[in-house]
């Protein structure tokens, strides 16, 4: 069985992206700048209202895995898609990106492939309206222990915490990975996701994970505080590696007694979709290569900077060349 440097488990979502202005968001009743879960009917209304749609395989951790695969890691993604047009598109697109899509599209059943309508406003802010469909039904049976148990690194998506079988799949996969000598971590995904499942998040982080990646709001939400320093200290007390992205203020990484802060160059994003996902791709690439945490953060920042320079959540440049130019490879 193949050994992977990086395996991700998350929602397999087709992103449908369109540009708009704030008046459109207000007219359609879309809350700016956050991810909202919607029902199937609402999804059809929003899809019909989109202008000049761009369709791409998405899902937070899937984007990360694709980015890391593009950098040259042996990578695999575990997620559920239906055997419909969008599901077949998704599976093929992941394969085309150099990522092994472990589970074939699922035939039968009523739930279609998940999709997220993403509206990008003039300031680059993304407003996501996601119909989860079949992807949220992921369970332990979708996670082969032959894949999880042979992963060097495993990365889990917090959004899958919304169903008990997703939580169970995570715990089992994390334990398989660690028993096989790998390291397992999580993308916190969203402060609201933490609010819904705080106790389970903290238990998983403390007992089953080796690293956590989240933005400032997500890290704060773990311990219900507005004080980032307090949140970082408390998270670091239960997890050996904590990575906190702070948008234009850079990245803070805490590993045991070591702490580094890596600045970023402030730019106006064309599209902020995927910035955190591609940061994680770069950081995990560095981890897989055994690089220091500061270099990992710099690689992550470079990957994030590239993806916010264009529409879409995955890199368009050959990132290995970009990293070489910047002296990071």
Tell me the role of every PLM-derived stretch.
Residues 102-106, 118-163:
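Conserved phosphate-binding/catalytic loop of the ribokinase/pfkB sugar-kinase fold
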Residues 1-7, 12, 26-32, 37, ...:
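Conserved phosphate-binding/catalytic region of the ribokinase-like
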Residues 65-74, 118-121, 286-289:
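Alpha-helix C-terminal capping segments
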Residues 153-233, 249-251:
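Conserved beta-alpha-beta core of the PfkB/ribokinase-like small-molecule kinase fold
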């Amino acid at each position: 069985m193949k050994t992977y440097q990086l395996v991700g488990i998350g929602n397999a979502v087709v992103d449908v992206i369109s540009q708009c202005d704030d008046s459109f968001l207000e007219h359609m009743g879309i809350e700016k700048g956050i991810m909202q879960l919607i029902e199937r009917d609402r999804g059809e209304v929003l899809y019909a209202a989109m202008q000049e749609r761009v369709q791409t395989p998405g899902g937070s951790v899937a984007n990360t895995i694709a980015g890391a695969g593009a950098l040259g890691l042996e990578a695999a993604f575990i997620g559920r898609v239906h055997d419909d047009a969008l599901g077949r598109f998704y599976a093929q697109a992941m394969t085309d990106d150099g990522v092994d899509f472990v589970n074939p599209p699922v035939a039968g059943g009523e739930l279609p492939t998940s999709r997220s309508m993403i509206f990008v406003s003039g300031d680059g802010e993304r407003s996501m309206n996601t119909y989860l469909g079949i992807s949220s039904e992921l369970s332990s049976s979708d996670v082969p222990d032959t894949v999880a148990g042979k992963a060097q690194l495993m990365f889990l998506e917090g959004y899958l915490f919304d169903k008990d079988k997703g939580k169970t799949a995570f715990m089992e996969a994390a334990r398989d990975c660690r028993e096989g000598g790998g390291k397992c971590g999580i993308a916190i995904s969203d402060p609201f996701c933490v609010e819904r499942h705080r106790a389970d998040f903290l238990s998983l982080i403390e007992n089953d994970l080796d690293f956590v990646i989240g933005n400032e709001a997500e890290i704060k939400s773990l311990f219900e505080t507005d004080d980032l320093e307090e949140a970082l200290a408390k998270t670091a007390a239960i997890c050996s590696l904590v990575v906190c992205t702070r948008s234009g203020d850079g990245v803070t990484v805490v590993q045991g007694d070591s702490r580094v802060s890596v600045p970023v160059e402030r730019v106006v994003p064309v599209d902020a979709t995927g910035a955190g996902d591609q940061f994680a791709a770069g950081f995990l690439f560095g981890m897989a290569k055994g690089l220091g945490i500061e270099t990992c953060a710099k690689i992550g920042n470079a990957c994030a900077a590239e993806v916010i320079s264009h529409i879409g959540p995955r890199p368009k440049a050959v990132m290995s060349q970009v990293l070489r130019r910047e002296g990071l490879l």
